From Swiss-Prot:
TM spans (from-to): 11-31
Name of the molecule in the record: Protein trichome birefringence-like 5
Location(s) in or outside the cell: Membrane
Region of interest called Disordered, as start-end residue ranges on this chain: 65-127
Family matches, as InterPro entries: TBL (IPR029962), TBL_C (IPR026057), TBL_N (IPR025846)
Domain of life: Eukaryota
GO MF annotation list: O-acetyltransferase activity
UniProt record similarity statement: Belongs to the PC-esterase family. TBL subfamily.
Keyword list, A-Z: Membrane, Signal-anchor, Transmembrane, Transmembrane helix
Residue numbers covered by motif GDS motif: 215-217
Length: 485
């Protein structure tokens, strides 16, 4: 009887226990299901899950900074988690996003610094970034008032005998000159320095352009120097050549050298006076030269296409018939029986200036006028026994240092009245010092196999390497000072 009564109680006990277990199980399922639907409250959720970028205020200084890592930062997101986190996990999301933003910003800054560090391609580094202070100091400095100094390694800009474009008449070392101090002088303006010459940077500035030198044999002297100094900036020197296949000779008056890697040209156009030379026939049928001082030189059509022009005239105005002025100077159809050479020079420069004003676009073209280059004849002139041999260093004192010919004052007057700006390469006084720089007896030693007499010395032109290299250095410095060089 007692056994049958205890059995129902056992069943009831098991039933209660089972029911309680089921209730606890269902509550647990409900509880954990809710936690799963709210990940921001889940104990399994961490701040390491990447979140999307959102618009947030800047981070406060109290937040930790994460060091940048190489490579791109990629953030993958789940749309469901994004929506849930916005509803329940704002604090954690903000901290995570700020850390990711710091990584991206640091990576961006590092990339920009690396790009700046790379600079331009090798061989085309502009000296403007390296010698900015030197260039700025040149502004307001008279580049043509100074002295010649030596002792550093900058000059010569190329070694004697290394440049195949030097005329025999200017190749003094090959022609037997043994002293070499004249090669090592550089020009130092008072109050500033010229930027160090950079041939490659010069070529970069000439990229796609034409540089043309127009004038007499003094400008050919400078033209050959220009070819030589620019050649030093080429890694492959075979990429420079005369487009017509011509060798440089005294008799030819037009050369075009192409620099393939920079798509630029350097040209020379011979024009002794910049105005038109002609001839007239006399009663006996003979012809005599004339100079039309009111008409521009026949070569002017070539000038128009150049981007940078360097003009000169001067030395031919002191020779024979030009200086005498008898039945030589012409205006219109009238030939003057006698005319003053200085006045003819003035009118010729006005003719040139007028042509520049009417034909040059200053927004696209740049014009230089290279001033008179000093000669140093002793005991005569070029055709009357004048000499300069034996000079081995620059003039240190004397009246010649401050000598300034009337021709240069006329040049300055003409330029001042022009509408198109012209840069005057006023090399007169700096060449006054350099009595040691001329070929003298070390000019061209033979012509057609015949030895040239040393009784006629060249004290007008310059040995190369030599003084004209400085003229081209001054052109380079002037280009650096241009607002859009």
């Amino acid at each position: 009887m007692s056994t049958s009564s205890s059995f129902p109680r056992t069943i009831v006990s098991y039933t209660v226990t089972t029911s309680l277990f089921i209730v606890i199980f269902l509550c647990s399922v409900f509880f954990f299901t809710r936690r799963t639907l709210e990940p921001s409250l889940s104990p399994y959720h961490t701040a390491d899950i990447p979140l999307p970028a959102v618009d947030l205020p800047p981070p406060t200084p109290l937040l930790p900074q994460i060091e940048p890592h190489d490579g791109d930062v990629t953030v993958e997101t789940n749309p469901k988690e994004v929506e849930d986190s916005r509803r329940g996990g704002d604090d954690v999301a903000v901290e995570t996003e700020l850390k990711l933003k710091d990584v991206e910003d640091s990576h961006t800054e590092k990339t920009e610094e690396e790009e700046e560090g790379r600079g331009e391609s090798p061989g085309e580094v502009s000296v403007e970034s390296v010698e900015h202070a030197v260039i700025e100091k040149m502004r307001g400095c008279d580049l043509y008032k100074g002295s010649w100094v030596k002792g550093d390694d900058e000059y010569p800009l190329y070694q004697p005998g290394s440049c195949p474009y030097v005329d025999d008449a200017f190749d003094c070392q090959r022609n037997g000159r043994r002293d070499s101090d004249y090669l090592n002088w550089r020009w130092k303006p008072d109050g500033c320095d010229l930027p160090r010459f950079n041939a490659t940077d010069f070529l970069v500035k000439l990229r796609g352009k034409s540089l043309m030198l127009v004038g007499d044999s003094m400008n050919r002297n400078q033209f050959e120097s220009m070819l030589c100094v620019l050649r030093e900036g080429l890694s492959d020197k075979s990429r420079m050549y005369e487009v017509h296949g011509h060798n440089i000779t005294k008799g030819r008056g037009y050369f075009v050298f192409k620099f393939e890697d920079y798509n630029c040209t350097v040209e020379f156009v011979r024009s002794h006076f910049l105005v038109r030379e002609g001839v007239r026939a006399n009663a006996q049928g003979n012809t005599n030269p004339t100079l039309s001082i009111d008409r521009i030189d026949k070569s002017h059509a070539k000038w128009k296409r150049a981007d940078i022009l360097v003009f000169n005239t001067g030395h031919w105005w002191v020779h024979g018939k030009t200086a005498r002025g008898k039945n030589y100077y012409k205006e219109g159809d009238y030939i003057y029986p006698k005319f003053d050479a200085t006045e003819a020079y003035r009118r010729s420069l006005k003719t040139w200036a007028k042509w520049i004003d009417q034909n040059v676009n200053p927004k696209k073209q740049l014009v230089f006028y290279r001033g008179y280059s000093s000669a140093h004849f002793r005991g005569g002139e070029w055709d009357s026994g004048g000499s300069c041999n034996g000079e081995v260093e620059p003039v240190k004192k004397g009246s010649i240092i401050d000598s300034y010919p009337l021709k240069m004052k006329i040049v300055q007057e003409a330029i001042k009245e022009m509408q198109v700006p012209v840069i005057l390469l006023n090399v007169t006084k700096l060449t006054n010092f350099r009595k040691d720089g001329h070929p003298s007896i070390y000019g061209k030693t033979n012509t057609d196999g015949k030895k040239v007499s040393t009784r006629r010395q060249d004290c007008s032109h310059w040995c190369l390497p030599g003084v004209p290299d400085v003229w081209n250095h001054l052109i380079y410095a002037s280009l650096l000072l241009q607002p859009h060089s």
